[in-house]
UniProtKB/Swiss-Prot annotation:
<comment type="function">
    <text>Required for maturation of ribosomal RNAs and formation of the large ribosomal subunit.</text>
</comment>
<feature type="repeat" description="WD 5">
    <location>
        <begin position="556"/>
        <end position="595"/>
    </location>
</feature>
<keyword id="KW-0539">Nucleus</keyword>
<dbReference type="GO" id="GO:0030687">
    <property type="term" value="C:preribosome, large subunit precursor"/>
</dbReference>
<dbReference type="InterPro" id="IPR036322">
    <property type="entry name" value="WD40_repeat_dom_sf"/>
</dbReference>
<feature type="repeat" description="WD 4">
    <location>
        <begin position="513"/>
        <end position="552"/>
    </location>
</feature>
<keyword id="KW-0690">Ribosome biogenesis</keyword>
<feature type="repeat" description="WD 1">
    <location>
        <begin position="311"/>
        <end position="351"/>
    </location>
</feature>
<keyword id="KW-0698">rRNA processing</keyword>
<dbReference type="GO" id="GO:0000463">
    <property type="term" value="P:maturation of LSU-rRNA from tricistronic rRNA transcript (SSU-rRNA, 5.8S rRNA, LSU-rRNA)"/>
</dbReference>
<dbReference type="GO" id="GO:0005654">
    <property type="term" value="C:nucleoplasm"/>
</dbReference>
<feature type="repeat" description="WD 2">
    <location>
        <begin position="353"/>
        <end position="393"/>
    </location>
</feature>
<dbReference type="InterPro" id="IPR012953">
    <property type="entry name" value="BOP1_N_dom"/>
</dbReference>
<dbReference type="GO" id="GO:0043021">
    <property type="term" value="F:ribonucleoprotein complex binding"/>
</dbReference>
<comment type="similarity">
    <text>Belongs to the WD repeat BOP1/ERB1 family.</text>
</comment>
<feature type="compositionally biased region" description="Basic and acidic residues">
    <location>
        <begin position="10"/>
        <end position="20"/>
    </location>
</feature>
<protein>
    <recommendedName>
        <fullName>Ribosome biogenesis protein BOP1 homolog</fullName>
    </recommendedName>
</protein>
């Protein structure tokens, strides 16, 4: 192959093409002087040389008129920054402007950066007394090591052969006294140590107040009477040692004429005034923590899940135990079925299908009847005989319901109707959220989540009549409950609970719940304490004998609280939440007014139910006599914790 030699003209063209298409890291620079300090050419008329060796003239600066015209014509003039390296202006983008603003405000230049990330405490605050692993020691830990035996043998042989020599004594360096050292090398005497130990720091000079300002407020300035009184008072009895004065600016303030006098008085105070040693308490921080009671003293309380009761195909919204019975409880769900369960073996005893989803179920508190009140989404409420349990009580309930007169007139607010087979129905006209009984068993109330007072009714079973107790309602209705012994009605809105005296038809007390949105309420069996749970995860204990505000508020759940229940005999309270947990508290109400109530969380019970639409556990109830807890779940299951 024959190669032609390129002449000088072709070689020049080729090199020019290569230079034109060659890329470099400095393509954004207008000149090609390289990455060198531009200050090298401050004394020259040029700023460097190009690739051909020609001088690059420095850019001419615009005069004031040209800069003014550029400022008026260019809308991005305020974004332009002069780049001395390239000799031109650079326009900043939005991100660079934000970084500059952040740096100017003493913030991080990275927009959106959060320097305060959540801290995860990986260490436990509880001191354990038992080891994590209690595995017994192996056999080889009691037998001498063979490797150590061989190593010792080699060392003995080396000593015998003279290969190992004893280490030479270290030469003691000459210690020179350091005159300017903070801690001298020589040990201090007892007198010096006592002087250091008994050193009392001097008290600090009090900070100046508003009266010592060069421009004090008008109330600190003295008028003629106060000035005359100050001059007549002895120097020892004066409240201030000086007369406050006002100046227009700081440069007009003269020198302080009492400076040397104040320094002299300070020296006299330090020299003559005795100092007192401040005793420090060396207390372990663990001793400052409150002593928690022993859990064994709080037993019994539910600890484990015994079994699940399955049968409902939707949400289980309400639970209720038969009065003075320890075997049967009722449940109502979204599937429109009313089920009666045996607590002993978890067997479903009876299932009744209704014409709507059930919102609430409540047994009549009278033990002589087996009467159930059920509210449904079909705008109806029924009073039905459970037909489960003691036969004598079932017969008594049927006879009582059949003798009731359900004759309705035009003046009646609601229409009562006897359906036969031990069932009464009331057409409410709205979806009732809950039904609650009075302790005597003749009155019960229903309400809906609304601001209208027309959706709150008190019903009388013996007369088959209903009435509206309120003509006006403040706030959105959320909960309702009767007083256990007095004719009082607890009406709960989002943030407040109002106690009404039904006998006198007047407001008795207004309670602040401490929650932003109350979801459930329980009044204790004496009526002196109210337990409140809210959608904002706050659980409050309100002692009505102490105050109308919460005595104790905790936030142990991570989701909204759906139910609060109290045990009839044991000092136990339980809350259930959408975080699939139920927390059991030991809550002993003190009968002595001088002794404080006891409130300690003892157990967190977890369920394996799946959440649906953010809901998990909807209701809970304690066994009447045993320390057992029953919870109703959104997936249709009912759990028993023992």
């Amino acid at each position: 192959m024959i190669h032609k030699r390129m002449n000088s003209t072709e070689l020049e063209r080729t090199s020019k093409k290569i230079d034109d298409y060659d890329s470099s890291d400095e393509e954004d620079l207008r000149n090609t002087i390289g990455n060198i300090p531009i200050s090298w050419y401050d004394d020259f008329s040029h700023v460097g040389y190009d690739k051909d060796g020609n001088q690059i003239e420095s850019a001419k600066k615009n005069d004031d008129m040209e800069e003014f015209l550029d400022r008026m014509d260019d809308s991005n003039y305020w974004r332009r920054v002069y780049d001395r390296q390239s000799g031109g202006f650079v326009t900043l983008n939005d991100e660079e402007v934000k970084k500059l603003n952040a740096l100017d405000a003493s913030k991080y230049p990275l927009v959106g950066y959060n320097p305060y990330q959540p801290f995860l405490d990986i260490f436990s605050s509880q001191t354990e007394i038992h080891p994590i692993s209690n595995r017994p020691d192996s056999k080889r830990s009691f037998i001498p090591s063979l490797d150590e035996k061989r190593l010792v043998g080699k060392m003995v042989h080396a000593i015998k052969m003279g290969w190992v020599r004893p280490s030479r004594p270290k030469q003691i360096e000459k210690r020179v006294y350091d005159l300017w050292a903070d801690n001298p090398c020589s040990e201090k005497t007892k007198t010096e140590l006592a002087r250091i130990r008994m050193h009392f720091p001097a008290p600090k000079v009090p900070l100046p107040g508003h009266a010592e300002s060069y421009n004090p407020p008008a109330e600190y300035l003295c008028d003629e009477e106060e000035l005359k009184k100050w001059e007549e008072t002895d120097p020892e009895d004066r409240r201030l040692d000086f007369i406050p004065k006002k100046y227009d600016c700081l440069r007009k303030v003269p020198a302080y004429d009492r400076f040397y006098n104040d320094r002299y008085q300070r020296c006299l105070d330090l020299y003559l005034a005795p100092r007192q040693r401040k005793m420090k308490l060396n207390i372990d921080h663990t001793e400052l923590l409150p002593e928690l009671p022993n859990l064994t003293d709080m037993r019994p309380f539910p600890t484990t899940q015994s079994f699940l009761m399955l049968g409902h195909s939707g949400q289980v919204r309400s639970l209720s135990f038969e009065p003075e019975s320890t075997e049967i409880f009722a449940s109502g769900g979204e599937d429109g079925t009313l089920r009666l369960w045996s607590i002993c073996d978890g067997r479903c005893l009876k299932t009744t299908s209704l014409d709507g989803s059930i919102t609430s179920v409540a047994y009549c508190p009278l033990a002589k009847w087996t009467l159930l009140a059920v509210t449904m989404e079909s705008n109806k409420m029924i009073l039905t005989n459970s037909y489960c349990g003691d036969r004598h009580r079932i017969t008594t309930t049927t006879e009582y319901l059949s003798k009731l007169r359900c004759e309705s007139s035009e003046s009646d607010v609601l229409k009562w109707k006897y359906e036969g087979k031990g069932t009464l129905s009331v057409d409410l006209g709205y979806i009732a959220r809950q039904v609650v009984w009075h302790h005597k068993g003749d009155y019960f109330a229903t309400f809906a989540n609304s601001k209208s007072p027309k959706l709150i009714y008190i019903h009388q079973l013996s007369k088959c009549k209903s009435q509206r107790p309120f003509s006006r309602l403040k706030g959105l209705m959320t909960v309702l409950s009767f007083h256990p012994s007095e004719p009082f009605l607890f009406v709960g809105t989002q943030r407040y609970i109002r106690i009404y005296d039904l006998a006198k038809c007047q407001l008795k007390k207004k309670i602040i719940t401490g929650s932003q949105w109350m979801s459930c309420m329980h009044v204790d069996f004496r009526g002196d304490n109210v337990f409140v749970g809210g959608h904002d995860r706050v659980f409050s204990w309100i002692d009505l004998q102490l105050s109308s505000k919460p005595w104790k508020s905790v936030k142990h759940h991570t989701a909204a609280i759906r139910g609060v229940t109290q045990h009839a005999r044991c000092p136990l309270i339980a809350t259930v939440s959408d975080d699939s947990t139920a927390i059991v508290y030991y809550a002993r109400i003190s009968s002595d007014s001088l002794k404080e109530n006891e409130f300690v969380p003892v157990r967190r019970l977890r369920t394996q139910t799946a959440q649906k639409n953010g809901l998990s556990i909807l209701a809970a109830i304690f066994h009447p006599s045993q320390p057992w807890l029953i919870t109703a779940h959104v997936d249709g299951s009912i759990a028993l914790f023992t």
